[in-house]
Every structure is written in structure tokens, then in C-alpha cells.
Amino acid sequence: MGDDNTNNTSITKSSPTDAMGGGCPIAHDINPANHMYKPNQNPHPDQTKPLSTERITSTIPRTEKDNWQYPSPQMFFNAMKKKQYEPKEEDMSVVISIHNTVNEKCWEDVLQWENDYKDVCPNPKLKKFKGKATDFSPKAKFLNTFLGYKLPFDRHDWIVDRNGKEVRYVIDFYEGRINKDSGKSIGIYIDVRPAIDDFSSLKDRVLHFFK
């Protein structure tokens, strides 16, 4: 899908694949006051096994002093139940690993775009983000309508702080190739690019197209 000037990444994942197939369930469980995960660390009533409440700190800067924290297995399990999924306690370690790896790769791709502005802003930060699973981007709809690609299973908009300027990035998440034996996707394909909200972002997209 390298039809335009985007950073496209494919990440291999292992079973269970269904957990991420309907959009990231925890990405919408955000406290609007500080854009942090609501820390529901209590065991779910349907839970049959204990889950860790330990949270891993990401490499993604949130402020000058701290980085974003990923949800714990317990938080992720609770969020999935809230979204009407049927998670299994024994799958949470794999689900968390996929979730965290995907987000780290998204940030890595964002930094590739931001590298053009390193003289102005050597340390961009992720200010906030929003899940928009059913709000398909214009590019995703174009690829689906005219080239027959499947629609992404999830979309996030990330707002990056570039020395006080808010720059919006659109991230589309696609299912990767299908395993012939299981019939399920074994990878996640990530399409990261700045939204064309101003002339500067349009220029970046055009310049990257010709690189």
C-alpha cells in the first residue's frame, strides 16, 4: 500500500488476533482532564484468574518530565469487558504485548516525520490521542473504493506537541496477511502520516512522496 507519502509498517503478531480486530478497546477509556487511562485496577466480576496491575512506561514522551504509561493487564481486561469483548485472562500477556509494540512502532514512525523539524523541536511529545475506529480517513475510503483494499479495523488521531504547535497525525491500522491454516490475520499493518490540516503538513506529505 505504498501508494503515497506515508510511513507504512507491518508488524507480525501472534494469537490471539481477535483482541485487536475491532479497534483498540482501551484507547477510548481516557480521562479527558489529563488524557491518561482511567486506572480501573479492580478485578472484574467475571474474572476467574488474578491479573497483574503493573503498568509499563512507554518511550513516548507526554511532558518534559514523564512518558505515557501503558495499561496493566487488569486494566486492559476490564476495558475489553466494558466494550463487550470476551477476553481470556491467559491471553492478556499477548494482547498487552501486541498493543504496546504497535504503539511504540507508531511513535517511531511519527518521529521519522518529525525528524524534518529536529532543529526546531528536537524532542516532540505526544500531547493526546483519540480513537476513531469507525471514522474512516479519506485515504482509507479511497483505497477501499477504488483499489479494493479492506477498510482499517481501527484509526487513531495523535496530537503531537512540536514546540507548542499541535500537529495532528492520522494512524490507520489494517489487518495483515491471513494465515492459511487458521484463517486469521497474523500481522498488523500501520499507516502513519500527518493530517493535511495546513500548508506545512501538505508540504511534508508532498516532499515525502518524492523521497
Curated annotation (Swiss-Prot):
Gene Ontology BP annotations: cytochrome c-heme linkage
Coiled coil: none
This protein's record includes keyword Lyase: yes
Keywords assigned: Heme, Iron, Lyase, Membrane, Metal-binding, Mitochondrion, Mitochondrion inner membrane
Enzyme Commission number(s) of this protein: 4.4.1.17
Any one GO CC term of the record: mitochondrial inner membrane
Segments of this protein annotated with the region Disordered: 1-53
A molecular function (GO) term: metal ion binding
Comp. bias intervals (Polar residues): 1-17, 39-53
Pfam families: Cyto_heme_lyase
Main localization, broad class: mitochondrion
Reaction catalysis annotation: holo-[cytochrome c] = apo-[cytochrome c] + heme b
Localization terms from the record: Mitochondrion inner membrane
Family: Belongs to the cytochrome c-type heme lyase family.
Known role: Probable lyase that catalyzes the covalent linking of the heme group to the cytochrome C apoprotein to produce the mature functional cytochrome.
Protein name: Probable holocytochrome-c-type synthase
Record organism: Dictyostelium discoideum
